[in-house]
From Swiss-Prot:
GO CC, any one term: membrane
Key words of the record: Acyltransferase, Lipid A biosynthesis, Lipid biosynthesis, Lipid metabolism, Repeat, Transferase
Catalyzed reactions per annotation: a UDP-3-O-[(3R)-3-hydroxyacyl]-alpha-D-glucosamine + a (3R)-hydroxyacyl-[ACP] = a UDP-2-N,3-O-bis[(3R)-3-hydroxyacyl]-alpha-D-glucosamine + holo-[ACP] + H(+)
Stated name of the protein: UDP-3-O-acylglucosamine N-acyltransferase
UniProt keyword Nucleotide-binding, yes or no: no
NCBIfam families found in the cross-reference section: lipid_A_lpxD (TIGR01853), PRK00892.1 (NF002060)
EC number(s) from the headed UniProt entry: 2.3.1.191
Subunit relationships: Homotrimer.
Protein source organism: Chlamydia abortus (strain DSM 27085 / S26/3)
């Protein structure tokens, strides 16, 4: 185990390039969430829902934004104050105190199978039983995990991290600093079939590629299919969660986020800075503009041309959903009022009948 690191609060502030308030000699040797932090931990407040813990936490220091420091700075606590985004400073603390766990298999393991035509860069790690097929190209300082397969003519850029049991099929192009979690399959054939006169389904050849640009992250057991003729493309900086299905010839823009179990059907184009909530389904052959947020379990059946928050099935603006939900919640009271009106109408009807038969 690595030796425990200890910083004074002032040393930590200097490393993070932030302001410090409180006892600058407080020793800090670890990180923890605000509700469980002890005296040797640094923690942070990112969500105001957890502000109640500021008074009771035992943390040696709390990372706050300047706005938060104005609200809570009067408390007798040690604070590290950043301009904004405490979670970013906290992530830097995590990197300081917690080193990644090494697999223990440096270099190229003797059980790895590497085709003689493959090109392997400098300082590459290829773990046991990984397979690198013909004419594949692995960039410098890239890591290929145990049992992973890199297909023929596929390329990976520098500083990529391919975890165990990943399959990268043939002719896939992957940029720099891409992270692929275990079980992901990149470049499988799309779900394209033609049905003949006898009702039998015949699979169509898919000749396109999958192109993954720089700084993309792909979650565990996520699948990205190649296009039939054109390429499936994941643009720079996009983050994809676990168990996401991206069909043939889909294009996802820059710096978007796709949450677990979402599915995007073929030939759909997703814009930049789009957030797709968990279990969202998006039909094929449509486009989603930039800066759209889709809530969990949204069903998107038509193109979205205006930025904003959408939800429901079929997808519609959040404000519209909010109004509809409010009306639904009022239905029991409306039903009660309707029942009372019906009773009054019955009473009035009975009185009218009595008046009609009175001589």
């Amino acid at each position: 185990m690595p030796q425990e690191l200890v910083y004074t609060l002032q040393q930590l502030a200097d490393l993070l390039k932030v302001e410090v308030q409180g006892n600058t000699e407080t020793p800090i040797s670890g990180v923890e969430e605000i509700s469980a932090a002890k005296a040797h931990h640094v923690t942070f407040l990112d969500n105001e829902k957890y502000a109640r813990f500021i008074k009771i936490t035992e943390a040696g220091a709390i990372i706050l934004s300047k706005a938060q420091a104005q609200k809570y700075g009067h408390l007798n606590k040690n604070f590290l104050i950043v301009s904004e985004f405490p979670s970013i400073a906290f992530q830097k603390c995590i990197e300081l105190f917690i080193s990644p766990v090494d697999s223990g298999f440096p270099g190229i393991h003797p059980t790895a199978v590497i085709h003689p035509t493959a090109s392997i860069g400098k300082d590459v790690c290829i773990e046991p039983y990984a397979v690198i097929c013909q004419h594949a190209c692995i960039g410098d300082s890239t890591y290929i995990g145990t049992g992973s397969v890199i297909g023929a003519y596929s390329t990976l850029g520098e500083h990529c991290l391919v975890h165990p049991k990943v399959v990268v099929r043939e002719r896939v192009e992957i940029g720099k600093r891409v992270i692929i979690q275990p079980g992901a399959v990149i470049g499988s054939c799309g779900f394209g079939y033609i049905t003949n006169a006898f009702g039998r389904h015949k699979h169509l050849k898919h000749l396109g590629k999958v192109i993954i640009e720089d700084d993309v992250e792909i979650g565990a057991n996520t699948t990205i299919d190649r296009g039939r003729f054109k390429n499936s493309v994941i643009r720079e900086g996009t983050k994809i969660d676990n168990q996401v299905q991206i069909a043939h010839h889909v294009e996802v823009g820059k710096h978007s986020m796709i949450v677990a179990q979402a599915g995007i059907a073929g030939s759909t184009k997703i814009g930049n800075h789009v957030i797709i909530g968990g279990q969202t389904g998006i039909t094929g052959h449509i486009s989603i503009t930039d800066h759209v947020i889709m809530m969990a379990q949204t069903g998107v059946t038509k193109s979205i041309s205006s930025p904003g928050i959408y939800g429901g099935a079929p997808a519609r603006p959040y404000q519209e959903i909010h109004r509809q939900v409010a009306k639904i919640r009022s239905l029991p009271k409306l039903e009660e009022r309707l029942g009372m009106l019906e009773e009054k109408v019955k009473g009035l009807s009975a009185q009218s009948t009595e008046l009609q038969i009175t001589p």
